């Protein structure tokens, strides 16, 4: 995950909160990337220590960051990792804990529906988001 420039003027969070976003897999897309995670899998968002201290990536139950999600989650100075537990909410959000509107939705599924196929294999890297199954 890298921190890249802001959202375009047609994005819902344009000029609201952070002008930065997380780039997944080297993405410089115009909005934060929505992800799909499978119950029982482990996913790691890896950032440089300077990015993690300036833009700590955390998981939340809501886009407004009212409730942090911590079940199966480990955060260090260089990564945030989640092992998606059975019974996890169907929707989570990865967000910068400091800046508003810097992050996106994670859809949680019980079954592998061929989602995240761009990651491929049993262990894949998304940006430096490492997906371990």
Regions found by a protein language model. Give the residues of each.
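Extracytoplasmic copper-binding redox domains, predominantly the cupredoxin/blue-copper superfamily
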Residues: 1-114
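Residue-level recognition of conserved structural "scaffold" positions that shape functional pockets
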Residues: 110, 127-128
